[in-house]
Amino acid sequence: MKTGASGKKALVVVDMLNDFVRPGAPLEVPETRAILPALRRRIRKARRDGELVVYVCDSHRKDDPEFARMGWPPHAVEGTPGAGVVASLAPEPGDVVVEKRTYSGFHGTTLHFLLRGHGIRSLTLAGCVTNICILYTAADAAMRGYDATVDERFVAGLAPDAHAFALDQMEGVLGVRVVRRPGRKAPRR
């Protein structure tokens, strides 16, 4: 069943940006490169099936207080190549790009209004970082009543334990549907 812009489903691709994906990037997340092939296939499938594909992208001002407060190096500074979606996953006509300045794709953005405007109630979240922007976007999606799914094949974390913790929190606390890789178990409740 095709749902797309008139229907019920969206694929939300979070922060698959040059400054997170490229080797040597300011905030490199090496695991992002491991998920690229599967995520590329998932994006193609979403487009083919009529799902709305939304890219939620970190976009900081050069003097963003997050850098000093959190100790992050400057990254995804608006207008720089580092803030662009990695070329192999580049948005296509019909896809939507939403810029964010915080960890959540919903906080201070138009994402909720965009999704509601398209009648979308079901989201699959993909991208990075599992224990930061995926977790906080999933939390806000759940609090807004979306049916959210996170498939472990399409998300990357900074460290295996933080990645696993975030998946457990999304599933056990937020009610997000988490699709585990083979051999991985859901947390006990």
Residue ranges and their predicted role:
Residues 59-62, 155-156:
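Solvent-exposed loop/turn segments at secondary-structure junctions
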Residues 57-59, 128-129:
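Short, well-ordered beta-to-alpha junction loops that form the rim of enzyme active sites
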Residues 1-10, 38-49, 73-189:
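Active-site-adjacent betaalpha module
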